[in-house]
Curated annotation (Swiss-Prot):
This is COMM domain-containing protein 4. It comes from Homo sapiens (Human). The lineage of its organism: Eukaryota, Metazoa, Chordata, Craniata, Vertebrata. It holds the Pfam family COMM_HN. It comes from the Eukaryota. Component of the commander complex consisting of the CCC subcomplex and the retriever subcomplex. Component of the CCC (COMMD/CCDC22/CCDC93) subcomplex consisting of COMMD1, COMMD2, COMMD3, COMMD4, COMMD5, COMMD6, COMMD7, COMMD8, COMMD9, COMMD10, CCDC22 and CCDC93; within the complex forms a heterodimer with COMMD8. Interacts with RELA, RELB, NFKB1/p105. Interacts with CCDC22, CCDC93, SCNN1B, CUL2, CUL3, CUL4A, CUL5, CUL7. One of its GO terms (biological process) is signal transduction.
């Protein structure tokens, strides 16, 4: 069976297995747990002590707690990525075996944060490194008594790339012929146009 929150694919087996774990909690505690997971997804950090308190009644082992956080993170982020509305998500979770009141609690939480979550995921997705700075130089030899032939101009690029926000930038240097530089520039402009059309 295909589910919209899974991108119109089958639900992963590990998610199916953890649905029964979610059902062991009360719907109120599930909602509070969802709030914590949403904070983490929005980059605000997660309070593990609070999570342990919320799952204490259900007598979860540490593996169950981690699995519960992972499955909620998957469900909420996946639903946001695929623009699934709360009602559809609730229906799909019930089809997977989550009790109706649990699904309603989870979806209420999801609907409250759906828009900021989608915005945050959009900012974070498809981003591998951050460009911190660019330097360039063109070497062009007009003539030389030492060379038999004059070489074509060379473009030397130096990119300062940070792996993540707040990390120090690492230099990446490269040298390109004028032709290769023109191809690189054209492809970068094409990529920029495509990305800006996506919003």
């Amino acid at each position: 069976m295909r589910f919209r929150f899974c991108g119109d694919l089958d639900c992963p087996d590990w998610v199916l297995a953890e649905i029964s774990t979610l059902a062991k909690m009360s719907s109120v505690k599930l909602r509070l747990l969802c709030s914590q997971v949403l904070k983490e997804l929005l980059g605000q950090g997660i309070d593990y002590e609070k999570i342990l308190k919320l799952t204490a009644d259900a007598k979860f082992e540490s593996g169950d707690v981690k699995a519960t956080v992972a499955v909620l993170s998957f469900i909420l982020s996946s639903a946001a990525k695929h623009s699934v509305d709360g009602e559809s998500l609730s229906s799909e979770l019930q089809q997977l075996g989550l009790p109706k009141e649990h699904a309603a609690s989870l979806c209420r939480c999801y609907e409250e944060k759906q828009s900021p979550l989608q915005k945050h995921l959009r900012v974070c997705s498809l981003r591998m490194n951050r460009l911190a700075g660019v330097g360039w130089r063109v070497d062009y030899t007009l003539s030389s008594s030492l060379l038999q032939s004059v070489e074509e101009p060379m473009v030397h690029l130096r990119l300062e790339v940070a792996a993540a926000p707040g990390t120090p930038a690492q230099p990446v240097a490269m040298s390109l012929s004028a032709d290769k530089f023109q191809v690189l520039l054209a492809e970068l402009k094409q990529a920029q146009t495509l990305m800006s059309s996506l919003g």
